Amino acid sequence: LATSFKKDEKVYAITAPFLIDATHPLYNVNDVLNGIYIHGNVIGDVMFFGAGAGKLPTASAVVADVVDCVKHKGRNVMTLWSYEKLELGSAMEVERTFFVRIKDRAALEKAKEAFHAVQTVTVDGLDDEFGLVTANMTEQAFAQAAAQFDVAGRIRFDKTTI
């Protein structure tokens, strides 16, 4: 998932694996389909959805855009762009909730404390591994906590921004 937002005159952007709630419109985007979910200050929430991944769908979309440009040649839409350079904020400053897998069952209590865990996930038969859902924390705080453990994987999720 690629996501971005503007806060305090900085723009934050990241492309990474995310968990998406089943009630979110992007949840059903899969296979060769792409989706764009936008929240605008005037328009509110809108979503664009369609073929776009793979050789033929991508080519079809490009041809359709070119045909549309030719059909509307000479018609311009005035847009108000600013040449002011925006400052890119560090993704390490952004707060998120994470699901993290750790390959050291003996470190469970230490990991719960380090990640301020709100939920522990264990699976019967996987005696050497566990998962945690963290409290809301910055990417930087997550990286510092993760450096202490044998992390098998992480996935971000944040219902407030996606």
Please name every model-derived segment.
Residues 1-162:
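NAD(P)-dependent dehydrogenase/reductase Rossmann-like domain
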